[in-house]
């Protein structure tokens, strides 16, 4: 072992020299004896060696390198359940453990290089510049991240923005890796800002299945190739859970290949879900494009009843606003006097289900609760880039609404619509086949409250009936660790619950846990679309817990009334902190800097061509109309049970709408290849297979009253023409089977002798012209977004050969 250790010590020195060009032998002659390689190598134990090297680098004023190695040490000694390796100085390290330590040293030092290559952002300023328009919270974050650094933006602006983090699951990475390969494997922007979590499909019970093994291998390959600093492997956490708890910081801009990326908005950062190809580009380039959306303001007022958390609050908001109404394709900003009663965990649940409102994302104005939450983190690097913004008093919102938290009670969202919300008492006694407490919506706070509800039931003599299934899945291993510390896992088990590994479990229904067709489930998850989880109804974790004893829908109020709320508050810890419990000090809010001269361009990629020749359209697009309705969701377009086999457009098309519109595919083959639909087409998840399935069927164009935000971006990325047509006269003329002609050059639709004008955005035009986002990157490289967002009259012309849609698994 000593020989292995000495070799590892030499390798650490070599990594330092090769990665950061630091040679300790190049120090002054006075320091050589003290800081020589031989001196360092004499330390006993690899971790002791690292500790000495950290101190030496600090003394030699290599502060960043010293800090990086200090972080490596913290990761090494942290318990596995808290994201570490669980090592200690007193034990000899096995060869595999030494190899992992060396990997971390290499990865964290390489992170300094990627940070050096990144474009610096100008410091924010203390006050609003004179004459600048009033901005919303989200507009300020966009303005701060805009590459041009104008210091302001307005709705409708097409801008390039720097991205702070990219996040993906093992399932969505499968498609992103394909896109990455199609781009020529150009490398990623920052190896310390890619959060990759195994949660959607992987499960210890099915790891041996080849398709699951392939997902694991792809993620492990990403870890090695990119030298990821933040990789925790499979079933450590649900994608959003530990990212929000330990990484997202106020003021950041985060892009993720999952529709519930919006969850991190709880901390005052802008977190937006997109499709796999759309997310791969900022992973590579460090930037993306945004057409600045409108925002709505929801002011939370009143005081919630004890035991009412974020899940019931967002169900109430869904009841009041409904899907695809005022929040559709807009950012939802939460503020108001009532937020002081909502913990960070409660805010997380509310932002999480902004996706079900059809909003782009949700975001809370940061406050002292936010600050206290972030301050509790383990690593300094994840709490030292905080920037607090708040909306101006004269900010312009598309709508401003009040929600009274005093009106919130235990609610029940009936299958198959998350906005079909009624009080639990209206359906009390409904027979259930399964009770599930889990999914990303369900926070640590929710699990603790569910355990206390179960505890009250057990004290009253309630016992679980023999029939039915009960499953509790924690959002992460740190949460499970906390529940064990609080002696609450035993409560779940005593109440008949099986405790699973962290993952999406029954929510997405792609892994070992799947509801049987026809079963009636009660779940604390976020989505209950048709063909997703049997007949799934949505409630809070407390309601699931109360209902689990008799397998009948039960209002939890009686059991909630028996809880000792002082104990409840003590158990919640920092994740359940509210304003009344936190230090009453003021935050320092800042403003985006107006520094256009500060803008720096990144080096161009070496894999693109400067050719600008663009052939004209060969003629109008013709076909026959196939009518569909409102809310055609991604679960219907690309059913979850077939996603792992959807490697190509053709494979995806085999199952398009087969559950909801079984004749759709055959009619497409018969020439009904122009879809005309209603509101919110493509709502639901970020999965690109929904677009791939339409392309694979032979659909040439989708015309709708409105599209879901992510789906609308996915269409031009993959080469499917999507047209938003608000004109009601068009729908009066568009009969099923009608002949239609679409002139893309003139942007006109001809039908039944009538003429209807449509518009494509500048970015849509550019992507169509170049054949999709992959082809555009091959042409422009890292200057892709600069080229396609440049202020110019793009016009439209013939699409180049469509890019091959990647095999992506997103939810």
Swiss-Prot record:
A GO molecular-function descriptor: iron-sulfur cluster binding
**A GO BP annotation:** L-amino acid biosynthetic process
Which EC number applies?
4.2.1.-
State if NAD is listed as a keyword: no
Enzyme class at the top of the EC tree:
lyase
Induction remarks: Very low expression levels near the detection limit.
User: Listed disulfide bonds for this chain?
Assistant: none
Q: Which residues bind [4Fe-4S] cluster?
A: 440, 504, 507
Q: Which domain of life is it from?
A: Eukaryota
Residues annotated for substrate binding in this entry: 258-260, 527, 532, 686-687
Q: What SUPFAM superfamilies is this protein classified in?
A: Aconitase iron-sulfur domain (SSF53732), LeuD/IlvD-like (SSF52016)
What protein name applies here? Putative aconitate hydratase
Corresponding gene?
acoC
């Amino acid at each position: 072992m000593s020989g292995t250790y000495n070799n590892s010590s030499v390798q650490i020195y070599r990594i330092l020299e090769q990665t950061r060009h630091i040679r300790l032998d190049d120090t002054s002659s006075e320091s050589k004896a003290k800081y020589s390689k031989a001196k360092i190598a004499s330390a006993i134990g690899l971790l002791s060696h690292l500790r000495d090297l950290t101190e030496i680098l600090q003394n030699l004023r290599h502060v960043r390198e010293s800090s990086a190695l200090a972080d490596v040490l913290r990761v090494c000694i942290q318990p596995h359940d808290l994201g570490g390796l669980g090592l200690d100085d007193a034990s000899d390290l096995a060869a595999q453990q030494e190899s992992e330590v060396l990997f971390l040293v290499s990865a964290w030092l390489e992170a300094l290089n990627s940070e050096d290559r990144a474009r610096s952002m100008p410091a924010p300023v203390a006050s609003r510049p004179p004459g600048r328009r009033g901005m919303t919270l989200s507009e300020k974050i966009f303005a701060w991240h805009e590459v041009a650094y104008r210091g302001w933006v307005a709705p409708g602006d097409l801008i390039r923005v720097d991205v702070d983090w990219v996040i993906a699951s093992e399932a969505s990475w499968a498609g992103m890796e394909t896109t990455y390969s199609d781009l020529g494997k150009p490398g990623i922007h920052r190896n310390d800002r890619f959060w990759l979590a195994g949660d959607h499909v992987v499960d210890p019970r099915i790891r041996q299945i080849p398709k699951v093994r392939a997902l694991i291998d792809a993620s492990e390959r990403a870890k090695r190739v990119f030298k990821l600093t933040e990789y925790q492997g499979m079933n450590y956490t649900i994608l959003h859970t530990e990212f929000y708890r330990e990484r997202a910081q106020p003021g950041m801009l985060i892009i993720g290949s999952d529709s519930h990326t919006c969850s991190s908005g709880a901390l005052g950062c802008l977190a937006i879900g997109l499709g796999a190809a759309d997310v791969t580009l900022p992973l590579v380039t460090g930037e993306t494009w945004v057409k600045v959306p409108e925002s709505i303001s929801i002011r939370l007022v009143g005081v919630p009843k004890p035991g009412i958390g974020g899940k019931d609050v967002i169900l109430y908001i869904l009841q009041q606003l409904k899907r695809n109404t005022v929040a559709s394709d807009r950012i939802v900003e939460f503020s108001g006097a009532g937020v002081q009663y909502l913990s960070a965990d409660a805010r997380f649940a509310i932002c999480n289900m902004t996706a079900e409102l059809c909003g782009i994302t949700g975001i809370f104005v940061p406050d002292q609760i936010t600050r206290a939450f972030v301050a509790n983190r383990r690593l300094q690097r994840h709490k030292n880039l905080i920037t607090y913004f708040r909306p101006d008093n004269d900010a312009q919102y598309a709508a401003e609404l009040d929600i009274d938290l005093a009106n919130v009670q235990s609610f029940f969202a009936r299958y198959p619509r998350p906005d079909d919300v009624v009080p639990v008492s209206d359906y009390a006694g409904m027979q259930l086949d399964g009770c599930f407490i889990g999914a990303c919506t369900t926070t640590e706070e929710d699990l603790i409250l569910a355990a206390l509800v179960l505890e009250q039931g057990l004290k009253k003599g309630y016992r679980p009936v023999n029939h039915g299934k009960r499953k509790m899945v924690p959002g992460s291993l740190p949460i499970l660790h906390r529940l064990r510390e609080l002696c609450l896992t035993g409560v779940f088990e005593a109440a008949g619950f099986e405790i699973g590994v962290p993952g999406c479990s029954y929510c997405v229904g792609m892994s070992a846990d799947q509801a049987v067709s026809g079963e009636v489930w009660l779940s604390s998850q976020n989505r209950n679309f048709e063909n997703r989880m049997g007949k799934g109804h949505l409630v809070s974790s407390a309601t699931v817990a109360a209902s689990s004893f008799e397998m009948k829908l039960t209002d939890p109020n009686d059991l909630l009334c028996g809880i000792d709320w002082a104990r409840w508050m003590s158990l919640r810890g920092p994740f359940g902190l509210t304003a009344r419990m936190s230090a009453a000090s003021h935050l320092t809010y800042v403003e985006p800097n107006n520094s256009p001269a500060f803008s720096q361009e990144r080096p161009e990629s070496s894999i693109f061509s400067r050719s600008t020749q663009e052939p004209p359209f060969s003629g109008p697009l013709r076909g026959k109309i196939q009518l569909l309705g409102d809310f055609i969701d991604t679960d219907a377009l690309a059913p979850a049970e077939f996603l792992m086999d959807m490697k190509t457009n053709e494979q995806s098309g085999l199952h398009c709408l087969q559950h909801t519109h079984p004749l759709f595919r055959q009619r497409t083959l018969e020439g009904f290849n122009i879809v005309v639909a209603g509101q919110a087409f493509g709502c639901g998840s970020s999965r690109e297979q929904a677009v791939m399935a339409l392309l694979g069927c032979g659909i040439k164009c989708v015309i709708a009253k409105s599209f879901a935000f992510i789906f609308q971006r996915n269409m031009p990325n993959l080469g499917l023409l999507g047209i938003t047509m608000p004109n009601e006269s068009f729908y009066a003329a568009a009969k099923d089977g009608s002949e239609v002609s679409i002139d893309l050059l003139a942007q006109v639709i001809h039908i039944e002798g009538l003429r209807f004008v449509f518009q494509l955005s500048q970015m849509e035009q550019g992507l169509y012209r170049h054949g999709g986002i992959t082809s555009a990157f091959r042409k422009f490289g890292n200057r892709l977004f600069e080229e396609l967002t440049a202020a110019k009259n793009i016009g439209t012309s013939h699409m180049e050969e469509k890019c091959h849609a990647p095999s992506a698994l997103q939810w």
